[in-house]
Amino acid sequence: VCQPHKNRLMLMLKGSLQLGLLPQLHLNFDLMPVDFLARFIAFHSAGFNADSCVFNLHNPQPLSWEQYLDAFSRAGYCFERVSVAQWQQALRAVSLDNALFGVLGFYLDRLDKDIGDTTRILHDNARRGVQNMGEQYPEKDQALLNKGCNYLKTIGFL
């Protein structure tokens, strides 16, 4: 379950929205609905297969960072997309009340491993597990992105 106030990427997103500047990143972004995860876990907890008992529950459906940011733009958030260098320069002036303040060390000089390319994640067991359920990975479509934006707004994170 997403706990955005404890998640570096979510704090980076919120703090960047507070700054009005978001970095242009060329990577894919992961997003998996919790109801799908719950069904997956419930289905596979009933049995054990030593050859495929570890699942990397990553959703390989494509979603670029830019598409993710588009959802926040459509939700009414105003921000400028800037180069990573411009964004990192702006981080040097972040104040104590910005959500990024506590995680600045991860972003000032480089982007740490929590912003990685999801295309490198091995998910063969999970893919087979989804097929065994007779399901497909959820599409990372506008409806799912809107739901995520609304959730962050509803819980008072954004």
Description of each model-found segment:
Residues 20-30, 50-56, 127-137:
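Glycine- and acidic
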Residues 35-46, 146-153:
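Two-component system phosphotransfer/interaction surface
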Residues 120-158:
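Amphipathic terminal alpha-helices
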Residues 31, 62, 120:
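Short aromatic/basic micro-patch
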Residues 44-110, 152-156:
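Mid/C-terminal beta-alpha module of Rossmann-like enzyme folds, strongest
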Residues 1-30, 34-39, 43, 72:
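NAD(P)-dependent short-chain dehydrogenase/reductase
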Residues 22-24, 88-133:
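A hydrophobic C-terminal alpha-helical subdomain
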